[in-house]
Amino acid sequence: VQTYKNLLYLALAFPLGLVYFVGLVFGAALGVGLLITWIGLPILLMTLFAVTVVAGFEAALARYLGGVNASVPTFLAEFDISGGLVFPGNGFVDAIKRLVTARTTWTSVVLVLAKFGFGLLSFVALAVSGSVTGAFLAAPFIYDDPDVVLGISGMVVDGDYTVGPWVVDTFPEALVASVVGVVFLFVALNLLNSLARFHARYTANLLQVDDEGL
């Protein structure tokens, strides 16, 4: 069951990472660009708060899909909408101070930015392992299809010698290829599980609740 959760965790990484990256860059660029007006700073603060919410969501994914105990950012754990964060008033300044001084607020920014790179890596790993494994496992069913070529094309060595090509075109070769596919599937699943565990633990380490602010 955990393997399926890890695969789902990896599959979600790229689309989520892309959305996070675009949202953070847009919010930061808009806020910095409008700093000369009164609206720029609130946009930056809202972006920073949104990043902590995203990090809290990532902590939940790490717990429920990655199987790692990850804490939400400090500010999010202490957040109380009645404390005056949404509208200036009692506790508003203190809430802003807690937001910008909590270490996990800024590690949340690191996490959100790193998610895009991890998502890209996860996408490549899933695509390559899935396509290669699928091709080998399907060999006994497609080896004699004239529209399908299963094998490795020839490679030129030192400009004079050609190695290959190696093509699966007989049933015994197809059976061997399917066995290779089973072995590759086992190896790929272990590597993908390790990749998912690494990211879940990385998330948990970044979001460790700090006892004091910056």
Name what the model sees in each region.
Residues 1-214:
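Acidic, polar-rich N-terminal leader regions of halophilic archaeal proteins
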